[in-house]
Amino acid sequence: MVAEHATAGAVDGPAATRPRIRVQGAVKSFSGRVVVDVDDLVLGNQPIEGLIGPNGAGKTTLMRMIMHSTPLDRGRISLLPADGREVMLSSLAAHRMSRHGVVKSNQVIMDFDKLTIWDSLLLAVAEASYEQPHRIFSERTVFQRHEDEIRHYLDYFGFADPTAFAMSAGEKKLLDIVRCLLLKPSFLLLDEPTAGLPEDQTEKVMTVIRDVAGGGTSVVIVEHDLNVIWNLCGEVHFMAEGSVVLRGDPQSIREHRTVVEKYLGEGHV
């Protein structure tokens, strides 16, 4: 692989103090076609890492395999927490991932149409703090424990009326990101977190990502807006045809001939 070591990104922090995820011999096929075939991949050596590649490279499928929402055909995926106690993610039910600090945003936005913005976020903090969902709505003291944190994110992203429903794709995207943050992840997977957002909100999302990584969370981003990748990530993994074929610091990846030919095109270095 190119660039066997990556330069430090915008956020510092040794890998030993952060959780990592290891993917070993992970294969997934659909209708006889192999869409992911990853021999050995470690995510989390840098505070913020990027996963890029052309459409159909297997990026989102790999993220879903990590979350076990798409089961592996073979192989294993494990969480290596900072305390060293390995957790076999590929043996966990998808709904138990957040209990181990592994949280993923959604490329296809969750359906928030049946809950108000406020109620959607209350459910997230209920899950994060292991509260019974009904208590957070019915008991004032439980509600008050989480009110300030929710209001912070609502104000930061400019949700004008939290008692309303998230209507636009952009609002739903931001609401999904806030939901992830309220779950207090130790390892955060973000699938196209800035897709469709205006420039000012993209900048806010980037700031939040830096902040959460600065607090000790490992972050991996799948993103087609490469300015986000180049500006945030300390290490970038390049996927093509289901495999991770290159990894390195952003500069070495963006200049590599394979990336230019298969993804960027001439004139984009």
Which positions does each model-derived feature cover?
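Glycine-rich phosphate-binding loops of nucleotide-dependent enzymes
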Residues: 2-8, 13-269
